[in-house]
């Protein structure tokens, strides 16, 4: 039986390792992880639970290549970081100061047979000059660096929902071999439904917010609904729809629904000397051009007192940030944004989950037992293709953080199989 040694960098929950090991087992290839690197405490605890006989190394930037055992395959899910270009393109040296540099320096020193890298979809266009470019400078330098090291490199954006996972999660996968280019063309399968991985009959949560929500909407009508004030659409619920901050009249509700759209338009903003921003506060005079009501000021005052609106100065864009410009008159703006409520979205069991991010995981709910609850740890693992028996005994907040940053294990398995064919 063939024996393959591999290393796992930026290991996180070891999702890339899991997928690679599954591919090896499927192809009757013996494999051994000879080196793991991770620095996040919660991830280290999970690694300890899963691999009690192993001791992960710490910060990869501080580890000399001579201290890393020889290996055949490098696995890494590295962060997306821009490179610094000063004058002449230097290839490998252009990557210095980023974590990809450490991936490259290890590949250069150890010359393994191949590698698998995973990153966010945004890496494809990261740091490009304009929209006419297919890929940005960051990915260009990465590919040039890997090819200069002698690897035949393939890359592709793949979606987890096409590999048996009920989550719409696109990521870029790069894989390379010293012998030949791995084939990353796959036959996709129909997306499974979220209900296939959900548990049932579990305790639900109760809070003033949830009580108000369920008072206005039966659970079955909440499937796929988002809760945020600064966007519209049929799948969105606003705080005023459930009277979260106090009762609203029909006139007040009508104004709020119109205002949330008008505040995003560019009309007339140049006249007040400000660049357009997504969500501009509008003065009473501006509002009166699209909402004519004899009692407009009282309506605005009422909504401001209840907390649905805020009276604030417009903001100028300065150094990449929005800073309020007190030289301009105050206007009325919607108060609550996407992350203002304990619920961000109620998942639709008959659909796939949206892309799951660390910051959103705690605010995703499902309908169960006539009420609402958050995802369980087991459901979270299933949404990324981890086995049910995967040890994951850490606080909920840490679970959400690790899951939001992990990989879809079945996609890694599929990519790994293609790499193994080239060895």
From Swiss-Prot:
Domain SAM-dependent MTase C5-type, chain residue ranges per copy: 4-423
Designated gene of the protein: ngoBVM
Residues annotated as the enzyme's active site: 80
GO MF term set: DNA (cytosine-5-)-methyltransferase activity; DNA binding
PROSITE patterns for this protein: C5_MTASE_1 (PS00094), SAM_MT_C5 (PS51679)
This protein's record includes keyword ATP-binding: no
GO biological process, one term: DNA restriction-modification system
Keyword field contains Transferase: yes
UniProt lineage: Bacteria, Pseudomonadati, Pseudomonadota, Betaproteobacteria, Neisseriales
InterPro entries: C5-MTase (IPR050750), C5_DNA_meth_AS (IPR018117), C5_MeTfrase (IPR001525), SAM-dependent_MTases_sf (IPR029063)
Keywords, alphabetical: DNA-binding, Methyltransferase, Restriction system, S-adenosyl-L-methionine, Transferase
Record's signal peptide: none
Highest rank taxon of the organism: Bacteria
Listed name of the protein: Type II methyltransferase M.NgoBV
EC number from the UniProt entry: 2.1.1.37
Family statement: Belongs to the class I-like SAM-binding methyltransferase superfamily. C5-methyltransferase family.
